[in-house]
Curated annotation (Swiss-Prot):
NCBIfam families (UniProt xref): OxoTetrPhDc, PRK08130.1
Cofactor binding comment, as recorded: Binds 1 zinc ion per subunit.
A GO cellular-component term linked to this record: cytosol
Catalysed reactions listed for this entry: 3-dehydro-4-O-phospho-D-erythronate + H(+) = dihydroxyacetone phosphate + CO2; 3-dehydro-4-O-phospho-L-erythronate + H(+) = dihydroxyacetone phosphate + CO2
The keyword Nuclease belongs to this UniProt entry's keyword annotation: no
Membership in a protein family: Belongs to the aldolase class II family. AraD/FucA subfamily.
Organism from which the protein derives: Cupriavidus necator (strain ATCC 17699 / DSM 428 / KCTC 22496 / NCIMB 10442 / H16 / Stanier 337) (Ralstonia eutropha)
Designated name of the protein: 3-oxo-tetronate 4-phosphate decarboxylase
Length: 217
């Protein structure tokens, strides 16, 4: 099986897993992966839970549609990430409930939507900035994310959800899951008296994670 065929299968497998476990619903969300001669990306308005590998769109490095169904309307956003971060080999975007709710309720900080609650959030995710609301597919989002792609592993789109990039489709999905579960934890606990003041890991713990695991915090 060729690398492209394997990536098509992986995109569909990871998409189905995310859908079945409630990280996205309906036809929301998209996944892409880097190829030597372009990218694969899920089709526009496709349900991540029921995709055909042959229908996954192939796009050339110049952005032209090569094969498969029509590419996602967020193609420009995915391309901005790949063009500005050579280590990014996959991008996953979902409309995950707790992360969208977080943008409605108010994020922790604009440059860090969540505090460093757990060691695995610090190790696997790191800083996640908020991108103010724009309509789906707005070029302004791609332009903003292009400036951040090499600095962070993801962003949170206001009212739309997370966009996460990593070295593989599975690693991007794992990071997105860690991000969503941390948002769930924060949304569950943040109104508990005294919690917000002691929620973040102390500076010493963050230094230890940076030294031991090269954590980005």
């Amino acid at each position: 099986m060729s690398t492209e065929s394997k990536l098509r299968e992986e995109i569909c497998r990871i998409g189905a897993s995310l859908y079945q476990r409630g990280y996205t619903v309906g036809s929301a969300g998209n996944i892409s992966a880097r190829l030597d001669d372009g990218w694969l990306i899920t089709p526009t308005d496709a349900c991540l839970g029921m995709m055909d590998p042959a229908a996954v769109a192939k796009v050339a490095t110049d952005g032209s549609w090569v094969s498969g169904d029509k590419p996602s309307k967020t193609l420009m956003l995915h391309r901005a990430i790949y063009d500005n971060n050579r280590e990014a080999h996959a991008v996953v975007h979902t409309h995950s409930t707790h992360l969208v709710a977080l943008t409605l309720a108010g994020v922790w900080q604009p440059d860090d939507v969540l505090p460093p609650l757990t060691p695995y959030y610090v190790m696997k995710v790191g800083h996640i900035p908020l991108i103010p609301y724009h309509r789906p597919g707005d070029p302004a989002v791609a332009a903003r994310v292009a400036t951040l792609a090499a600095q962070v592993r993801g962003v949170l789109l206001e009212r739309l959800g997370p966009v996460v990039w990593e070295s593989s489709v599975s690693r991007a999905a794992f990071a997105l899951e860690e991000l969503e579960e941390t948002a769930k934890l924060w949304m569950t606990m943040k109104d508990t008296p005294g919690f917000a003041a002691r929620a973040a890991l102390p500076d010493g713990a963050l230094t230890e994670l940076r030294d031991a695991f090269q954590a980005r915090w």
